[in-house]
């Protein structure tokens, strides 16, 4: 896992088309903004897991 340090207002790039910007830090919560093309899905992990479960398969499980 790559670990990066960013301050509020700073951005990191994922490939050529996705940017992740730190919008704010309050206590133990970090607000981030993700700018990605329409064809790239962006979800919180718990939402992604729910979508996968509804599709009938858990990521990483042997089927």
UniProtKB/Swiss-Prot annotation:
Major localization listed first in the record, in broad terms: cytoplasm
Entry keywords, A to Z: Activator, Cytoplasm, Repressor, RNA-binding, Translation regulation
Biological processes per GO annotation: mRNA catabolic process; negative regulation of translational initiation; positive regulation of translational initiation; regulation of carbohydrate metabolic process
Compartments where found: Cytoplasm
Subunit structure as annotated in this protein's UniProt entry: Homodimer; the beta-strands of each monomer intercalate to form a hydrophobic core, while the alpha-helices form wings that extend away from the core.
Record-linked HAMAP family: CsrA (MF_00167)
Protein name: Translational regulator CsrA
UniProt organism field: Alteromonas mediterranea (strain DSM 17117 / CIP 110805 / LMG 28347 / Deep ecotype)
